[in-house]
A protein has these predicted regions:
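Thiamine diphosphate
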Residues: 1-133
Length: 133
């Protein structure tokens, strides 16, 4: 968990001509978020998209202890590191934000889109939130 951005940076470094897009959840992104700095310093333009649902896994009833992460503004951190960054709160803002970010990637920047998502949303094929450890 949390290996998406390091892998994306590695792919871009190994194949500079590749179009690299990394999609992360907020919890896993937090584990290796500073790899954005690596991408910026080494001029590895890629697009990183974060689904910020405020916690580990989906919890429709909000009753799982230790799940809450809050809605971290990773876009502000990304911008401070030199990325082009946007924060999106409404579904209709996603496509335009991705288009603007991808344009910046094509210009040689690291693009970053932090998308606030519903904490109740989850995949229906795999229910990680119902797994017990």
């Amino acid at each position: 968990m949390g290996a998406g951005l390091p892998f994306a940076v590695g792919v871009k470094a190994a194949t500079p001509e590749a179009q690299v897009i990394c999609l992360h959840g907020d919890g896993s992104f937090g584990q290796n978020a500073m790899e954005l700095d690596t991408a910026v310093r080494h001029k590895l333009p890629l697009l990183c998209i974060i689904s910020v649902n405020g916690g580990w896994t989906a919890d429709p009833e909000r009753n799982m202890p230790g799940r809450d992460l809050g809605y971290t503004r990773y876009d502000k951190m990304a911008e401070a590191l030199g990325c082009y960054a946007e924060y999106v709160e409404e579904p209709e803002g996603i496509r335009p934000a991705l288009q603007r970010a991808w344009k910046k990637v094509e210009e040689g920047m690291v693009g970053f889109v932090n998308v606030k998502t519903d904490y109740r949303a989850r995949a229906t094929t795999v229910r990680f939130s119902s797994r017990k450890t």
